[in-house]
Protein backbone atom coordinates (compact mmCIF):
# COMPACT_ATOMS: atom_id res chain seq x y z
CA UNK A 1 0.00 0.00 0.00
CA UNK A 2 1.07 3.55 -0.64
CA UNK A 3 1.69 5.93 2.29
CA UNK A 4 -1.12 8.39 2.93
CA UNK A 5 0.97 11.34 1.75
CA UNK A 6 1.58 9.75 -1.66
CA UNK A 7 -2.03 8.73 -2.30
CA UNK A 8 -3.18 12.11 -3.59
CA UNK A 9 -0.38 12.08 -6.19
CA UNK A 10 -0.98 8.51 -7.30
CA UNK A 11 -4.75 8.67 -7.11
CA UNK A 12 -5.41 9.09 -10.81
CA UNK A 13 -2.97 6.30 -11.68
CA UNK A 14 -4.60 3.93 -9.23
CA UNK A 15 -7.96 4.73 -10.75
CA UNK A 16 -6.65 3.83 -14.20
CA UNK A 17 -5.16 0.61 -12.87
CA UNK A 18 -8.45 -0.42 -11.30
CA UNK A 19 -10.27 0.35 -14.55
CA UNK A 20 -7.80 -1.79 -16.47
CA UNK A 21 -8.37 -4.73 -14.11
CA UNK A 22 -12.14 -4.37 -14.44
CA UNK A 23 -11.80 -4.28 -18.22
CA UNK A 24 -9.60 -7.38 -18.21
CA UNK A 25 -12.14 -9.33 -16.14
CA UNK A 26 -14.84 -8.73 -18.71
CA UNK A 27 -14.84 -10.93 -21.77
CA UNK A 28 -13.66 -8.40 -24.33
CA UNK A 29 -12.63 -9.78 -27.73
CA UNK A 30 -8.84 -9.97 -27.90
CA UNK A 31 -7.04 -7.85 -30.44
CA UNK A 32 -3.56 -9.28 -30.00
CA UNK A 33 -3.11 -12.74 -31.50
CA UNK A 34 -0.57 -13.79 -28.89
CA UNK A 35 -2.87 -12.86 -25.99
CA UNK A 36 -5.73 -14.56 -27.78
CA UNK A 37 -3.72 -17.80 -28.13
CA UNK A 38 -2.66 -17.64 -24.46
CA UNK A 39 -6.15 -17.01 -23.20
CA UNK A 40 -7.91 -19.81 -25.09
CA UNK A 41 -6.34 -23.21 -24.40
CA UNK A 42 -8.86 -25.14 -26.51
CA UNK A 43 -8.31 -22.96 -29.57
CA UNK A 44 -4.55 -23.26 -29.13
CA UNK A 45 -4.75 -27.06 -29.31
CA UNK A 46 -6.83 -26.84 -32.49
CA UNK A 47 -4.29 -24.48 -34.08
CA UNK A 48 -1.42 -26.82 -33.28
CA UNK A 49 -3.35 -29.86 -34.49
CA UNK A 50 -4.04 -28.11 -37.83
CA UNK A 51 -0.36 -27.48 -38.58
CA UNK A 52 0.73 -29.67 -41.53
CA UNK A 53 3.41 -32.27 -40.93
CA UNK A 54 6.12 -32.95 -43.48
CA UNK A 55 4.99 -36.50 -44.25
CA UNK A 56 1.25 -35.83 -44.06
CA UNK A 57 -0.64 -35.30 -47.35
CA UNK A 58 -1.42 -31.66 -48.00
CA UNK A 59 -5.05 -30.65 -47.79
CA UNK A 60 -6.20 -28.03 -50.26
CA UNK A 61 -8.98 -25.52 -49.66
CA UNK A 62 -12.36 -26.33 -51.23
CA UNK A 63 -12.05 -23.35 -53.58
CA UNK A 64 -8.82 -24.76 -55.07
CA UNK A 65 -10.30 -28.27 -55.31
CA UNK A 66 -13.31 -26.89 -57.18
CA UNK A 67 -11.04 -25.01 -59.62
CA UNK A 68 -9.09 -28.19 -60.35
CA UNK A 69 -12.29 -30.12 -61.00
CA UNK A 70 -13.60 -27.39 -63.30
CA UNK A 71 -10.35 -27.23 -65.29
CA UNK A 72 -10.16 -31.03 -65.53
CA UNK A 73 -13.60 -31.11 -67.13
CA UNK A 74 -12.66 -28.63 -69.91
CA UNK A 75 -12.00 -29.69 -73.50
CA UNK A 76 -8.66 -29.02 -75.16
CA UNK A 77 -10.01 -26.00 -77.03
CA UNK A 78 -11.40 -24.55 -73.80
CA UNK A 79 -8.05 -25.16 -72.08
CA UNK A 80 -6.30 -23.35 -74.93
CA UNK A 81 -8.67 -20.39 -74.54
CA UNK A 82 -8.15 -20.43 -70.76
CA UNK A 83 -4.39 -20.46 -71.26
CA UNK A 84 -4.56 -17.51 -73.66
CA UNK A 85 -6.82 -15.51 -71.34
CA UNK A 86 -4.59 -16.18 -68.32
CA UNK A 87 -1.53 -15.03 -70.27
CA UNK A 88 -3.30 -11.80 -71.23
CA UNK A 89 -4.70 -11.20 -67.75
CA UNK A 90 -1.46 -11.95 -65.89
CA UNK A 91 0.71 -10.37 -68.62
CA UNK A 92 2.82 -13.49 -69.14
CA UNK A 93 5.04 -13.54 -72.22
CA UNK A 94 4.69 -16.51 -74.53
CA UNK A 95 7.76 -18.75 -74.15
CA UNK A 96 8.52 -21.61 -76.50
CA UNK A 97 8.63 -25.11 -75.10
CA UNK A 98 12.03 -26.58 -74.34
CA UNK A 99 11.92 -30.35 -74.85
CA UNK A 100 13.37 -32.43 -72.04
CA UNK A 101 15.03 -35.79 -72.54
CA UNK A 102 12.46 -37.82 -70.58
CA UNK A 103 9.46 -36.10 -72.12
CA UNK A 104 10.72 -36.35 -75.67
CA UNK A 105 11.76 -40.02 -75.54
CA UNK A 106 8.77 -41.39 -77.43
CA UNK A 107 6.95 -38.25 -78.49
CA UNK A 108 8.31 -37.41 -81.93
CA UNK A 109 11.31 -39.59 -82.81
CA UNK A 110 11.59 -38.43 -86.44
CA UNK A 111 11.65 -34.75 -85.50
CA UNK A 112 14.16 -35.44 -82.73
CA UNK A 113 16.42 -37.31 -85.13
CA UNK A 114 16.21 -34.46 -87.66
CA UNK A 115 17.15 -31.92 -84.97
CA UNK A 116 20.08 -34.09 -83.86
CA UNK A 117 21.37 -34.28 -87.44
CA UNK A 118 21.04 -30.52 -87.86
CA UNK A 119 22.96 -29.91 -84.63
CA UNK A 120 25.84 -32.16 -85.70
CA UNK A 121 26.34 -30.37 -89.04
CA UNK A 122 27.98 -26.99 -88.50
CA UNK A 123 26.42 -24.27 -90.57
CA UNK A 124 29.10 -22.49 -92.56
CA UNK A 125 28.36 -18.79 -92.41
CA UNK A 126 29.66 -16.71 -95.24
CA UNK A 127 32.18 -14.23 -93.96
CA UNK A 128 31.41 -10.60 -94.66
CA UNK A 129 34.57 -8.90 -93.36
CA UNK A 130 38.17 -9.76 -94.14
CA UNK A 131 41.73 -8.74 -93.37
CA UNK A 132 43.90 -8.05 -96.42
CA UNK A 133 47.46 -9.34 -95.86
CA UNK A 134 50.37 -8.86 -98.28
CA UNK A 135 52.60 -11.94 -98.06
CA UNK A 136 55.09 -11.61 -100.94
CA UNK A 137 56.32 -9.04 -103.46
CA UNK A 138 58.24 -9.53 -106.69
CA UNK A 139 61.54 -7.59 -106.52
CA UNK A 140 61.03 -6.24 -110.04
CA UNK A 141 57.68 -4.63 -109.20
CA UNK A 142 58.50 -3.19 -105.74
CA UNK A 143 58.15 0.45 -106.80
CA UNK A 144 54.69 -0.08 -108.29
CA UNK A 145 53.62 -2.05 -105.20
CA UNK A 146 54.84 0.69 -102.83
CA UNK A 147 52.82 3.32 -104.73
CA UNK A 148 49.71 1.10 -104.71
CA UNK A 149 50.00 0.40 -100.96
CA UNK A 150 50.21 4.15 -100.34
CA UNK A 151 46.75 4.45 -101.96
CA UNK A 152 45.13 1.97 -99.56
CA UNK A 153 46.73 2.91 -96.23
CA UNK A 154 45.82 6.42 -95.09
CA UNK A 155 48.52 8.66 -93.63
CA UNK A 156 51.47 6.61 -94.86
CA UNK A 157 54.34 8.17 -96.81
CA UNK A 158 56.61 6.54 -99.40
CA UNK A 159 59.36 5.70 -96.88
CA UNK A 160 56.90 3.94 -94.57
CA UNK A 161 55.32 2.11 -97.51
CA UNK A 162 58.82 0.96 -98.61
CA UNK A 163 59.58 -0.37 -95.09
CA UNK A 164 56.23 -2.16 -95.08
CA UNK A 165 56.96 -3.91 -98.41
CA UNK A 166 60.45 -4.91 -97.27
CA UNK A 167 59.20 -6.56 -94.05
CA UNK A 168 56.55 -8.96 -95.35
CA UNK A 169 54.06 -10.45 -94.46
CA UNK A 170 52.16 -7.31 -93.42
CA UNK A 171 48.53 -6.44 -92.80
CA UNK A 172 47.33 -3.87 -95.33
CA UNK A 173 43.76 -3.35 -94.13
CA UNK A 174 41.67 -5.01 -91.42
CA UNK A 175 37.91 -5.57 -91.06
CA UNK A 176 37.12 -4.75 -94.68
CA UNK A 177 33.92 -5.66 -96.50
CA UNK A 178 34.20 -8.55 -98.94
CA UNK A 179 33.82 -6.42 -102.09
CA UNK A 180 36.45 -3.90 -101.00
CA UNK A 181 38.84 -6.67 -99.88
CA UNK A 182 38.63 -8.34 -103.28
CA UNK A 183 39.18 -4.97 -104.99
CA UNK A 184 42.35 -4.33 -102.93
CA UNK A 185 43.57 -7.88 -103.56
CA UNK A 186 43.11 -7.54 -107.33
CA UNK A 187 44.91 -4.17 -107.40
CA UNK A 188 47.90 -5.39 -105.37
CA UNK A 189 48.23 -8.62 -107.36
CA UNK A 190 48.12 -6.61 -110.60
CA UNK A 191 51.32 -4.78 -109.56
CA UNK A 192 53.22 -7.91 -108.47
CA UNK A 193 52.12 -8.67 -104.89
CA UNK A 194 50.79 -11.88 -103.38
CA UNK A 195 47.75 -11.18 -101.20
CA UNK A 196 45.82 -13.37 -98.79
CA UNK A 197 42.34 -12.60 -97.44
CA UNK A 198 41.88 -13.75 -93.86
Curated annotation (Swiss-Prot):
Function recorded in the entry: As a component of the mitochondrial large ribosomal subunit, plays a role in mitochondrial translation. When present in mitochondria as a free protein not associated with the ribosome, associates with mitochondrial RNA polymerase POLRMT to activate transcription. Required for POLRMT stability.
Oligomeric and partner information: Component of the mitochondrial large ribosomal subunit (mt-LSU). Mature mammalian 55S mitochondrial ribosomes consist of a small (28S) and a large (39S) subunit. The 28S small subunit contains a 12S ribosomal RNA (12S mt-rRNA) and 30 different proteins. The 39S large subunit contains a 16S rRNA (16S mt-rRNA), a copy of mitochondrial valine transfer RNA (mt-tRNA(Val)), which plays an integral structural role, and 52 different proteins. bL12m interacts with NOA1.
Associated clinical condition: Combined oxidative phosphorylation deficiency 45: An autosomal recessive mitochondrial disorder with onset in utero and characterized by poor overall growth, failure to thrive, global developmental delay, poor or absent speech, seizures, hypotonia, loss of walking, acute progressive neurologic deterioration, brain lesions, and facial dysmorphism. Laboratory studies show increased serum lactate and decreased mitochondrial respiratory chain enzyme activity in patient tissues.
Organism: Homo sapiens
UniProt modification remark: Two mature forms are produced by differential two-step proteolytic cleavage. Cleaved by the mitochondrial processing protease to produce the long mature form and subsequently by the mitochondrial intermediate protease to produce the short mature form.
GO terms for MF: mRNA binding; RNA binding; structural constituent of ribosome
Cross-link (Glycyl lysine isopeptide (Lys-Gly) (interchain with G-Cter in ubiquitin)): 150
Gene Ontology biological process: mitochondrial transcription; mitochondrial translation; positive regulation of DNA-templated transcription; translation
Localization of this protein: Mitochondrion matrix
Alphabetical keyword list: Acetylation, Disease variant, Isopeptide bond, Mitochondrion, Primary mitochondrial disease, Ribonucleoprotein, Ribosomal protein, Transit peptide, Ubl conjugation
Gene behind the chain: MRPL12
GO CC entries: mitochondrial inner membrane; mitochondrial large ribosomal subunit; mitochondrial matrix; mitochondrion
Record's keyword annotation contains Transit peptide: yes
Residue(s) carrying N6-acetyllysine: 125, 138, 142, 144, 150, 163, 173, 178, 185
Protein name: Large ribosomal subunit protein bL12m
Pfam families: Ribosomal_L12, Ribosomal_L12_N
Protein family membership: Belongs to the bacterial ribosomal protein bL12 family.
Transit pept. (range): 1-36
PANTHER family: 39S RIBOSOMAL PROTEIN L12, LARGE RIBOSOMAL SUBUNIT PROTEIN BL12M
Effect of residue 173 to R: Reduced promoter binding activity of POLRMT
Result, substituting residue 144 to R: No effect on ubiquitination
Main localization category: mitochondrion
Amino acid sequence: MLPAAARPLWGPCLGLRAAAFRLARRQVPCVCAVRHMRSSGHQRCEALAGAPLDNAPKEYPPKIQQLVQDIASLTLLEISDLNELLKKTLKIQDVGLVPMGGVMSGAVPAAAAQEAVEEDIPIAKERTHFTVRLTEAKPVDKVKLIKEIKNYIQGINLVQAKKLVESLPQEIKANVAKAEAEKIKAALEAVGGTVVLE
